Swiss-Prot record:
Involved in ribosome biogenesis; more specifically in 18S rRNA pseudouridylation and in cleavage of pre-rRNA. GO terms for biological process: pseudouridine synthesis; rRNA processing. One of its GO terms (molecular function) is snoRNA binding. It comes from Methanococcus maripaludis (strain C6 / ATCC BAA-1332). Pfam families: Nop10p. GO terms for cellular component: ribonucleoprotein complex. The gene is nop10. Belongs to the NOP10 family. This is Ribosome biogenesis protein Nop10. The keyword rRNA processing applies. Coiled coil: none annotated. InterPro entries: H/ACA_rnp_Nop10 (IPR007264), H/ACA_rnp_Nop10_sf (IPR036756), Nop10_arc-typ (IPR023532). Keywords: Ribonucleoprotein, Ribosome biogenesis, rRNA processing.
Length: 51
């Protein structure tokens, strides 16, 4: 089972067709990998604050 997205309305679903507009849903592409972590300092600060 893969996460899918409706190209027409943008709703995420697990079904082959969107439940709102009956458009065929497509497989979502994963975000592009980058070794530069833009949000790493914020994530580490939040983790440190929780400890």
């Amino acid at each position: 089972m893969k996460m899918k997205k409706c190209p027409k309305c943008g709703k995420y679903t697990l079904k082959d067709f969107c439940s709102e507009c009956n458009e065929k849903s497509v497989t979502v592409k994963p975000p592009k990998f980058s070794p530069v972590d833009k949000y790493g300092k914020y994530r580490r600060a939040l983790k440190k604050a929780k400890m």
